[in-house]
UniProtKB/Swiss-Prot annotation:
KW Cell inner membrane (keyword) present: yes
Name of this protein: Probable potassium transport system protein Kup
InterPro entries documented for this protein: K+_transporter, K_trans_C, K_trans_N, Kup
Membrane topology: Multi-pass membrane protein
Keywords: Cell inner membrane, Cell membrane, Ion transport, Membrane, Potassium, Potassium transport, Symport, Transmembrane, Transmembrane helix, Transport
UniProt superkingdom: Bacteria
Cited function: Transport of potassium into the cell. Likely operates as a K(+):H(+) symporter.
GO molecular function: potassium ion transmembrane transporter activity; symporter activity
GO cellular component assignments: plasma membrane
Coiled-coil features, chain-numbered ranges: none
Annotated catalysed reactions: K(+)(in) + H(+)(in) = K(+)(out) + H(+)(out)
Main location: membrane
HAMAP family xrefs: Kup (MF_01522)
Protein encoded by which gene: kup
């Protein structure tokens, strides 16, 4: 097995000062901007009381501790796939053991993608709305839209230049959070007693809101403090476990100090209903302008992190056959830097709709959190299987741990569902549409693979040999290349044989069959060459990690160069005139695009799935583009795909 390129992960896996700074800039944008709206959402329109604020602070403290620190930082970060994290990386680790786990992986991935639509609007809106302190008539929506549109427009150029400033800016942001919070805690350290979980218990069981609802429903607002926890796991490959864990100590302290500082400020208004945002309320008047600027920059960085995470999520889904083929661009040579135009447009349209539909950040709070809550639950399910089967931890310990988190996350989900008619419907519908696309694509792919007919390639060697030497047939190409999905190297799809011999006899000097195996390791790039029939049939098996772009044209040329240098096969043209010049000859790829034939008897569900599959395939990019093939050397052939052939029938001839 030969290696195409270095397959090691190039992330910042070691603990370094640079790695810590990069972690601040890449990972903590979402969870780091939560203080902009969490305490505001908890206080809501309720009369301020110690039961409400201390109970809310207690819930925030224990949510961050249990969900973010213990579940993600301590436990889930250990479930890395060769240094990579995220829900699809976790699924790739266990998919061979239980393929059915693809369902929670798809649901969780779709929900996380939907969360990427709501994060930029609520983060940027919360920051920009600080301007209302100076003038309540300032139109914030145009400002928010301008920032979001500009953010999405620069994606195609990459984020290398501005990315260098993300870490320092987020360091300033967290330092500001801690300083502002500490300024309010001075002389009000009594609020720290909220660390006692009894305050949280009393809020959830005894408190009644202004709407005569149980305090339990405030969990929907509390959950906003941990919505960025999944990013710690998703961006594991960029920063490394040591850098994330150490930097989290600083981030968690800054967040908690700010939350408790806001709580102390709010309690100064005991007996009243507060107006405005307590985040800006704890700022000295002279600092508000600077605070708004820093908050806006932090919100932009949070949005950028979510956008980049969405690109990575889709690129992984593409390799795992969970998403229609879309064009992926690489604006820089830096590993992990990618740009997906269709997803960029989808997210931009979604963000603009959210801003125009909801208007204010307070109205968006109802839509925020529900989707990522679903991702949390799906990650818990996958994590349980990983701990049991891969790590072989005792069933009792895993059962108790997962039961605790299922209770916590289901409680959050129930509370978040209460916000369905206040914006939650948007994220549920968005998640549902994205999950539907993934499920249709995956289901159709399974149907196609299950019903694809394979034949023994050795049975056709004599015919291939004769065709290659038959000078009465015009030579189609010197080298003819087919992509095959046959895992067994002794087999080939019957459609390939149909293309070579029946559709139009294709004479060539050498027939190549390329097979791509997407492996669980993220950055593997290896290949194996098998000479099936000397000087006539060669098969190449590529083993590519699920994060590797399928640049088959480039990879194939690399293999050819290696084989020529090793003198494994004679590639010089068999045309006499070209052979004198030592010319290798031409290469032509044949891509077979299957279409649904009329000769089928599909079930209702299969017909539904295949109809949607071909619709999605029609609006996605072609197979040749997806595999990075040079269109000038590609022939696309349409071949019928007979699914569930109709039963035999009798046709009577009359005279």
């Amino acid at each position: 097995m030969s290696t195409i390129a270095d397959s090691k992960n190039h992330g910042h896996q070691k603990l370094t000062a640079a790695g810590l700074l990069i972690s601040l800039g890449i990972i903590y944008g979402d969870i780091g901007t939560s203080p902009l709206y969490v305490m505001k959402a908890i206080a809501g329109g309720n009369v301020i009381s110690e039961n409400l604020i201390l109970g809310g602070l207690s819930c925030v403290f224990w949510t961050i501790t249990l969900q973010t620190t213990i579940k993600y930082v301590i436990i889930t970060l250990r479930a890395d796939n060769k240094g990579e994290g995220g829900i699809f990386s976790l699924f790739a680790l266990i998919r061979r053991r239980n393929p059915n786990l693809v369902w929670p992986a798809m649901i969780g991935g779709a929900a996380m993608l939907a969360d990427g639509i709501i994060t930029p609007p609520i983060s940027v809106s919360s920051a920009v709305e600080g301007l209302l302190i100076f003038n309540k008539d300032i139109p914030t929506i145009p400002i928010v839209l301008a920032i979001i549109v500009m953010l999405f427009m620069i994606q195609r150029f990459g984020t290398n230049i501005v990315g260098k400033f993300f870490g320092p800016i987020m360091f300033i942001w967290f330092a500001m959070l801690a300083t502002l919070g500490l300024s309010q805690l001075m002389g009000n350290f009594y609020v720290l007693k909220a660390i006692n979980p009894m305050y949280a218990f009393n809020l959830l069981t005894q408190y009644t809101t202004v709407d005569d609802k149980s305090g339990f429903w405030l969990l929907g607002a509390v959950f906003l403090c941990t919505t960025g926890a999944e990013a710690l796991y998703s961006d594991l490959g960029h920063c490394g476990r040591p850098n994330i864990r150490i930097s989290w100590i600083f981030v968690k302290l800054a967040l908690l100090i700010n939350y408790f500082g806001q709580g102390a400020w709010i309690l100064q208004n005991k007996g009243y209903v507060i107006k405005g945002n307590p985040f800006f309320g704890i700022m000295p008047e002279w600092f508000i302008v600077y605070g708004i600027i820093i908050a806006t920059m932090a919100a932009i960085i949070a949005s950028q992190a979510m956008i980049s995470g969405s690109y990575t999520l889709i690129s992984e889904a593409l390799r795992l056959n969970l998403w229609p083929k879309v064009r992926v661009k690489y604006p820089s040579v830096k590993k992990g830097q990618l740009f997906i135009p269709s997803i960029n447009l989808l997210l931009l349209a979604g963000c603009i709709f959210v801003v125009l539909w909801f208007g204010e950040s307070s109205a968006m709070e109802g839509a925020y959190g529900l989707a990522i809550n679903i991702t949390f639950l799906m990650t818990t399910i996958l994590l349980a299987y990983y701990l049991l089967i891969i790590k072989r931890i005792s069933f009792i310990w895993v059962g108790l741990l997962i039961l605790m988190y299922l209770i916590i996350e289901v409680s959050f989900l129930v509370a978040n569902l209460e916000k369905f008619f206040h914006g939650g419907y948007f994220t549920l519908i968005s998640s549902g549409i994205l999950a539907f696309i993934m499920i249709i694509w995956y289901t159709a792919h399974r149907i196609k693979r299950r019903l694809t007919e394979y034949v023994k390639i050795q049975d056709y060697f004599p015919l291939i040999k004769e065709l290659s030497e038959d000078t009465s047939i015009p030579k189609y190409s010197t080298h003819l290349i087919y992509l095959t999905g046959a895992d067994n190297y002794t087999q080939i799809e019957s459609k390939v044989i149909y293309s070579i011999f029946q559709k139009q006899p294709k004479r060539a000097d050498i027939y190549w069959f390329l097979h791509i195996d997407v492996v669980d390791e993220p950055y593997t790039m290896e290949y194996k060459v098998r000479t099936m029939l000397a000087d006539d049939v060669i098969r190449i098996d590529f083993k590519l990690g699920f994060r590797v772009e399928h640049r088959i044209n480039l990879f194939f040329r690399k293999v050819v160069e290696d084989m020529v240098n090793n003198k494994e096969v004679d590639f010089t043209s068999r045309y006499t005139s070209l052979n004198k010049r030592n010319v290798i000859g031409d290469f032509r790829f044949v891509v077979l695009e299957k279409h649904l034939s009329n000769d089928n008897d599909l079930s209702v569900m299969e017909q539904f799935a295949m109809d949607w599959y071909f619709f999605l395939k029609h609006i996605s990019i072609s197979e040749s583009s997806a595999f990075g093939l040079d269109t000038s050397s590609v022939t696309v052939e349409k071949v019928p795909m007979v699914i569930s052939p109709m039963e035999a029938f009798q046709l009577k001839r009359v005279y």
